[in-house]
């Protein structure tokens, strides 16, 4: 199994368990400070009340950890087992969704002598569907950060197909690996939501 580390996530409340998809090889991203986390939350939920973010902490049980590891194909580090959930609402108090930040690489990639980061923010609504998605501060092909690619992942649920080249998902031609990693991140976000806050039959 692959090892993974560091979690900081935000999830929603309603979800139904889906059929297994190909293992995501993503690991969860952790922003260094609340200021950075808040900045990136607001980029994802631009209509959120900046002063009304709520944080909910969760601890996965041993059974949930085993289920997640089986579905994802890698082991969770201790810090991954106690995620934080960031809940967004607008200025009138309406629920907007939740946010999760995932770094979908298990091995570093070098570009121009520096590490090429790939950090994905995913927003999920109360119906358990992706409704926001953003790639942060990416130094590779910027098509990966644009709506023409990212909007294909909107409205997909855990039982959707996240494989690039199938079910209407078209990757960025110059970055096939990164395109799939972004798709994997969206699927993992929904799975983590399901286990943490949903009902599993």
Where on the chain are the PLM-derived regions?
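Intrinsically disordered terminal and processing segments
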Residues: 2, 8, 16-119, 125-201
